[in-house]
């Protein structure tokens, strides 16, 4: 490690309070704490930058500063000597922190604003297969100490556990009061967004997935936001690792991942 882009410690707390002319007034306390570290690794091949962070409602639930520094160092040093790749079509594993972007695009596609504007690649897909059949996704707004927990949404509508995907089938949308009225549907308690999206974990950990894939790409970082929410076309810059014979072979950079989300979701 030759240098650092610095470290950040942030802590926030407050009260969300909402009232309306229907004699509703209520609120809840919230807090958010984060520690972040970014380092620069250098050798004869050049320099690489990476980092790590921990974020939680309860400060005591944060990773230790030592562990955050160690993970930032590991991630930066393992990127040294990164190579470029020729055009190819191979399986891809998205590391958990970057895989969240795939699900953010999904939530945007099933949000009321996208649907009533007819600007979604998942139009008219309710009760149809949109993910592989082993995928289950729920919204659980009442998880203790979770960052997205909330008793009601920005309209004052009570939140509740909400099944979005069951065995790959789209079961419901995410709607505010306004978008629900535009669509002639009932609000789902999602004014202001979703609260604690939970993707049911599979039976394999990352190492098992790498072994099963045998040859392909492990993506650990994404650049840009090349997603067309109307067509589902997906094209983003990426870096990560080339997998060969079920093992990490070497780091890669300056690559582009391209496809279409409708097909990507169904082939998870």
Regions found by a protein language model. Name each.
Residues 1-150, 154-160, 166-169, 247:
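Active-site bordering "gate/hinge" segments
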